[in-house]
Amino acid sequence: MQEFVKRMIVEREDLKGKINRAKKAIENPPFGSDREGIEMLKKQVEGMETYLFWLCQRLDKEGV
């Protein structure tokens, strides 16, 4: 397996973890979180999910 594919796999798993943690923070906001911050986090998660989708597409193309 090529090195860049290995890096993409690590990145995919890391990103999945970040998305899950962010979603938990949205569901149960930390003390002191404001509405605007939570809305911004929701948008950030949307962007991360889009990035994850395309990263997975690239990995599929590589046969992973």
Feature locations, PLM:
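Extended, charge-rich alpha-helical interface modules
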Residues: 1-64
